[in-house]
């Protein structure tokens, strides 16, 4: 895999002490039933990696190793297109607005009123200008976005749900159907990604290398 994913100039810094030190994303287990990798089985909602920390990841590479006969696809949604599709009123109203992001590693969607004292969480701008493209993206995702700051709970929930519909509109989503040997890379600051479910009796394994990020504001 390492020979296939040599970093081009300006691509950023891979996380981990070695470029070959990549995360195995799989639901496979060893003979004793212990997990061999991370991010196990099943559907995973749209998200941007580590949106709930101060410096979200910049990008990622995924390399297909073991692919189920159906499902286990990776979807990508354009945050530029999502921003373009927002009502003009919202672009003005929320131009300086922040969204609180949090995540529960048990895969549970956190409640807007959840106690975050022992959870990873961070506030990110709703709109973000990508320094490479100069384009504005809508940095909001179903998996991690908890609440819109300075809004009442019910209005925040309502607007977030409407935003999720915009970011997940099939017109701006690409769905990658994996084959062994596929190598996919993406900009974590300009698109969201998600994972579809697959049969429980089948395995799925991919290698991931992540590019370290920075602050969005």
Where are these regions (language model features)?
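Fe(II)/2-oxoglutarate oxygenase catalytic core
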Residues: 1-185, 189-217
């Amino acid at each position: 895999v390492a020979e296939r994913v040599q970093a081009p100039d300006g691509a950023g810094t891979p996380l981990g002490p070695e470029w070959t030190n990549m995360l195995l994303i799989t639901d496979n287990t060893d003979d004793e039933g212990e997990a061999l990798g991370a991010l196990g089985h099943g559907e995973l909602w749209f998200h941007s990696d580590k949106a709930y920390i101060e410096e979200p990841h910049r990008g990622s590479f995924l390399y297909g190793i073991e692919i189920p006969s159906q499902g286990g696809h990776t979807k990508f949604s354009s945050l530029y297109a999502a921003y373009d599709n927002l009502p003009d009123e919202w672009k003005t109203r929320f131009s300086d607005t922040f969204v609180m992001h949090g995540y529960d590693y048990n895969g549970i969607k956190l409640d807007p009123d959840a106690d975050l004292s022992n959870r990873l969480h961070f506030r990110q701008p709703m709109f973000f200008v990508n320094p490479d493209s100069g384009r504005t993206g809508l940095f909001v995702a179903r998996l991690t976005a908890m609440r819109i700051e300075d809004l009442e709970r019910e209005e925040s929930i309502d607007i977030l749900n409407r935003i999720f519909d915009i970011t997940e509109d099939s017109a701006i989503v690409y769905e990658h159907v994996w084959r062994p040997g596929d190598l996919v890379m993406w900009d974590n600051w300009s698109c969201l990604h998600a994972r579809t479910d697959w049969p429980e009796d089948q395995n799925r394994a991919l290698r991931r290398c992540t590019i370290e990020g920075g602050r969005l504001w």
